[in-house]
Amino acid sequence: MFKCPERVSIKKKEDILDLPNLVEVQIKSYKQFLQIGKLAEERENIGLEEVFREIFPIKSYNEATILEYLSYNLGVPKYSPEECIRRGITYSVTLKVRFRLTDETGIKEEEVYMGTIPIMTDKGTFIINGAERVVVSQVHRSPGINFEQEKHSKGNVLFSFRIIPYRGSWLEAVFDINDLIYIHIDRKKRRRKILAMTFIRALGYSTDADIIEEFFSVEERSLRLEKDFVALVGKVLADNVVDADSSLVYGKAGEKLSTAMLKRILDAGVQSLKIAVGADENHPIIKMLTKDPTDSYEAALKDFYRRLRPGEPATLVNARSTIMRLFFDAKRYNLGRVGRYKLNKKLGFPLDDETLSQVTLRKEDVIGALKYLIRLRMGDEKTSIDDIDHLANRRVRSVGELIQNHCRSGLARMEKIVRERMNLFDFSSDTLTPGKIISAKGLVSVLKDFFSRSQLSQFMDQTNPVAELTHKRRLSALGPGGLNRERAGFEVRDVHASHYGRICPIETPEGPNIGLITSLSSFAKINEFGFIETPYRVVRDGIVTDEIEYMTADVEEECVIAQASAELDEYNMFKTPVCWARYKGEAFEADTSTVTHMDVSPKQLVSVVTGLIPFLEHDDANRALMGSNMQRQAVPLLKTEAAIVGTGLEGRAAKDSGAIIVAQEDGVVEYVDSYEIVVAKKNNPTLKDRYQLKKFLRSNSGTCINQTPLCSVGDVVTHGDVLADGPATDKGELALGKNVLVAFMPWYGYNFEDAIIISERLIKQDAYTSIYIEEFELTARDTKLGKEEITRDIPNVSEEVLANLGEDGIVRIGAEVKPGDILVGKITPKSETELAPEERLLRAIFGEKAADVKDASLTVPPGTEGVVMDVKVFSRKDRLSKSDDELVEEAVHLKDLQKEYKSQLAQLKVEHREKLGALLLNEKAPAAIIHRRSADILVQEGAIFDQETIELLERESLVDLLMAPCDMYDVLKDILSSYETAVQRLEVNYKTEAEHIKEGDADLDHGVIRQVKVYVASKRKLQVGDKMAGRHGNKGVVSKIVPEADMPFLANGETVQMILNPLGVPSRMNLGQVLETHLGYAAKTAGIYVKTPVFEGFPESRIWDMMIEQGLPEDGKSYLFDGKTGERFDSKVVVGYIYMLKLSHLIADKIHARSIGPYSLVTQQPLGGKAQMGGQRFGEMEVWALEAYGVAHMLQEILTVKSDDVSGRTRIYESIVKGENLLRSGTPESFNVLIKEMQGLGLDVRPMVVDA
C-alpha cells in the first residue's frame, strides 16, 4: 500500500497529544442541536428539543384547550450532497413533530409536518440552493456578571456591575460621586435611575432591619455595664428600638447611636440592642437607608414602577407584574446555564446542576452582587474588576446555538398564531386537531432567512482545502448581537494574554476587520458553556505526566504553566531548577517546583494555517499574518507538488479539510477506477466500502475539484490511510504551490518593487497551470406570451455559428468556445409592442408566422475562453403527453430500479444478520429484552442467543425493544439504529429515483419547463501580471517571463527558475524565507523532505551542517553567470529552493477594455468597472496632464464625444462610417444635468446667444 512520504525532523519526541478533529467545532455543535440517531425519550434538554419544551405547552386564553409537544422526528435526505449542488437545491431533511391536543372533546395525538430543516454534510458545511455555505462561530460577551470601574471627571473612581442575561433586560448598578448606588435597567433607558435601596425593597426586603441583616452580621449587645454603654456610642442600630407598651420609637434601624439616644433607651428599660457589625454612617448601605424615599415593600414597588414608566398610574398589581416580567419570568428573562455559571462563580454561590438550572434572577443574586460591589469600593483585596476582553468573559456561539435562537423566535411567532386559532375555532362545525392550528411557516421562514441572509451564514471560501478548513474554524465578533465594525475600538481587536492556545494571534484579515475576525488555535476546543479551552499536561511533584487537562481562560489564571520547549530528563522531570513559565498572563522565570502544568505543544499557540509556515519564529508578525492569509488564496495547480520544507501539519490539514479520501475501515482494495474505489472489509470480505471520487467539479471559487486514486487493486489498507488525492494535495499532503529554484538578486531592473522574474521553463512544464471552471445557466419558462423553447432553429443566425450546437440546441461536450459563441440556443415569443409598424402590418395581412420569436440564446461572456466539459439538462415530464414508446421505456426503467432496490435491501439484511450474529451468537443475555408494545418477553435474562432468537431480533425495530442499560444493549442499539437508517435511506433513494423516472425533475422552480447548465473549463498558464507569493508574506507580481537561455545559471549549468529582489528581505524582517531557501536547497540535493514545526524547527547550525554534507557552499551563496552574456556576476548570490504559490488574483480576471457599452441613465456617461463593461474614468488630474501638454482637440474629444455628448456620439459614428475625420462636439449631458439641478433650486439658468 502507498504511504505518505516520511519527513525528516530534528524533533526528538513527538507531541504527547494529537490534533483534535479540525472541523469538530461545526459538526459537534450541530449534532447536539439536532441529536440525530437518539430515540425521543433519550434526547437531552438541549438544542431543538429545548426550544420545543420551552414554547410548549400552549394554552388558550381560557385554558380550556392545551397543545403539548411530545417528540420530533427527522426524515432522511432525499438527495446526496453532490446531487443537491448539481440541482441547485437545499440539502435538508423533513421535520415532523408529534403533538397532543387536549380540549373539551377529549385527547388527540397527531404528527404534524413542520417543513424541512437544512442538515450539515460530513465536512461541516450546509448546501443552500446548491451553494456550499458555512455558519461562522460568533464570539460575544458572555452572559453573567461583570464588575467595572471608570474615572469621574472629578478624579474619583466609580465602581459598577452589570448583570447580562442571555435574553432579557440588563441590570446595572453604579456608584455615584456621593457613594450612593443607583440601578439602571437596560442601557438604552439609562436616564431612569432607581436608588438601589428602593430596588432592594421592591424585591421583597420591606423593613430596614431585614436589609441590614442581609448586608451586615447582627450582634446583640447588653446595656447593663457602663463600659458597654461607652462602647456602643457611634455604632449603628440593626433594628428599631420600640417601647412595647406605647409603641414609641426610640431609635430606627440604620441610625447612629449617640449618647443622648442611648440614655433615652436605657431610661425606657431596654436591656439589650441589636448592632450592625462593621457599619458606620459612611457605609453606602447606611447612606442609602437615610436617602431612600420609601419605607415599605408596597411604596418601593410603586416608586420603581413610576420611574420605569413615568406618566402611567402606579398600582400595586401593575408594579408587581412589571418586576416579575422583567426578572422572574423564564420566558422573558433567561440567564442561561452560562450566565448562571458565571454569576455563581463570581459571587461564590454553589455550581451544582440544580443551581445551574435556575435561569431567572434571584433576590440572593442582587444582594450578593451589591455586597461584592461594596467590598470592591471598600478596597477588599479579594475582589477584582473584570477585564471584558479576557476570554473568561467572552464566549463562542457555534452553529447549533445560532440556529437554536432563530428556531426559538420562529416558534414564538407560531405560538401567537396557535393561540389565536384556538380561540377563534368553531367547535360546533368541526373537530379541532393539532394539524389545523399549527402553521409551520414561522419556523421555515426563519431558518430560510438565517441561512440565506444572516451575516454569519457565509458563502464558503473554497479556493483550496486550507481556505475551506479555515473558514469552518473562523471566529467572528461581528453579526447580530455582536460588535459593530465602525464602533469597535483598539482593545477589542488587540491580542490578549488569554488568547494563548485559544485564538491565533497571527491569523486575522488586514483592513477594517482586523482583530474582529480571528481563527481558533490548532488544539483549541469549545466546551459546553461556549468557552474556548486549550490542553495542558499536568505536572505533579515536579514530574510532567501524560495526563491532559483542558482549561478555560479563567481556570488557567491560577496555574503556573511551563513552555512545551522546557527540557525534560528521561523521568519526565525538568532538567533545570528554573524555567520560563506563565502566571496570570505574565511570563517569568519560575522555580520548577511551583509549576503546575505544561504546554502540550509549541504549535498550540497558532492556528492551522499559521502552523503551515516553516520558520515562523524568524518572521515579523505582520508578514506572518500576510503569509497565513495568502496561503488561503493559493490556486490548486494542475500538477501538484508537496513542499520540500514543511511543518508536519500538511497531512492533517488535507485530511480534515475533506479534500482527500481516507479509508474508514481496515480492508483490501478490490476495485479501482477514476470514479470509484471499492474496499472489501477485513473482518468480513463480503461487505464492501464504496468510495465515490469527485471528478472535475466546480468549487465555489470557480477552481477545479478533482480526486485521483492513489491505491491499486490488492493493496491492504488500514483505517485512516489515504486512498485518493484531491485538489491541491500530493500523496495525501497539502500541496498549494511548487518548489522553485530561486536567486535573490536584481536583474536588469525587472524585479523592482517586489516584482518577480520567472523562467519560461516553468511555463513549458505547466508548473503553475491551473484549471478554472465556469458555470452558465439558462432556463426556458412558460411565459404569458407562450412557451420559451430551447432549439437549434434560431432566427437570423448563420450555420457556422451553430456548428457546435447539437440537434437539441445545446453545445456539444468538448467544443472549444470563445466570447460571443452560443452555448444554448433559445427563442422567446415576441410581444406586440416589440414589433415594428411594418412587421405588424405584414402580420395582419399574412397571419402568424414562425418569425414572431426573438433570439434569447446563452452566449459566452467577454473574457471567457475554454472547452465545454459538461452539460446538465433538467426538465419536467408531462404525464399526459407521453408517447407509448416513452411509457414502455419508463416501465423497463422502473422494473430495473425495483430489481436493484431489492438486491440492495437483501444485501443490507445479510450484513445486518451477520453483525447481530457476531455480537450475540452463543452469548448470554445480561438482561431481559421486552417488546415495548405487546410487553412480551422476547429474550429471558441469562438466556443463550441462538440463530432463532437472532432472527427474531432482526425483524424487530429498535423503537419496539426495551432492555435494561448495559454494554450489550448499547452495541445492539447502534447496530439496529444504523440498519434502520440504511433501510430508510435506501427506501428514500428508491422513491426519489422512481419519481424522477416518472415525472422528471419535479423540483424545478414554478414556471420552468427546462433548465440547462453548461460548464466551461479553461486552462490558465502563468502570465505577466499574475500575483505570486511565498509562505512568509513575500508577495509580488510576475513582471517578465524570460527565455530559459537568458536566465542566470549556476556553475554546473543549471538555470535559476525564479529571481526575487533581495531588498524585499531586510525591511520586511521575514528571514524565514532565507532559511527556507537554504534548507530547501540542502534537502532537495539530499533528495529528502523535511519538517520544521513552528518554534521547534531546524536551528541555523543544523542547516549549515546539512549544506556542507551535500557539498553546497557553507554560506548558502553561489556565483551566478548571466545567461545573456555568459559573464559571471560580481557578487555571490543566495540560491536555493522556496515553495512559491500562485494566488487567485489572476490578471486574466482583471484586465478589461471597452469599445462600446452601457451608459448611465442620468449623466449619459459610460459606467465603470469590469462587471458593467465600463470605461476608464478620465478624472480631474488626467485632464491637468493633457492641459499641460496643450493637446486641446484630444482633450475635447475625451470630455465630449467619448463620454456624454449624446448627439456628438451619433455624429462621430456617422463620420467614421463615411470616412470623414471631423470632430463636431455638442453639449455634454452632464452640463444639462447641472442646468436642471439649478433650475430645480429656482434659478432661471438659460444659455444665451450673444452676438460677437
UniProtKB/Swiss-Prot annotation:
- Reply yes or no: does the keyword Nucleotidyltransferase apply: yes
Going by the UniProt record, its keywords in alphabetical order are: DNA-directed RNA polymerase, Nucleotidyltransferase, Transcription, Transferase
Q: Name one GO molecular function term.
A: DNA binding
One GO term (biological process): DNA-templated transcription
Q: Does the keyword Nucleotidyltransferase apply?
A: yes
Record's superkingdom?
Answer: Bacteria
A single Gene Ontology CC annotation of this entry is: DNA-directed RNA polymerase complex
| InterPro entries for this protein | DNA-dir_RNA_pol_bsu_ext_1_sf, DNA-dir_RNA_pol_bsu_external_1, DNA-dir_RNA_pol_su2, DNA-dir_RNAP_su2_dom, DNA-dir_RNAP_su2_hyb_sf, RNA_pol_bsu_bac, RNA_pol_bsu_CS, RNA_pol_bsu_protrusion
Record-stated family: Belongs to the RNA polymerase beta chain family.
* Quaternary context: The RNAP catalytic core consists of 2 alpha, 1 beta, 1 beta' and 1 omega subunit. When a sigma factor is associated with the core the holoenzyme is formed, which can initiate transcription.
Its name, as the record gives it, is DNA-directed RNA polymerase subunit beta
Q: What does the organism's lineage look like at the top?
A: Bacteria, Pseudomonadati, Chlamydiota, Chlamydiia, Chlamydiales
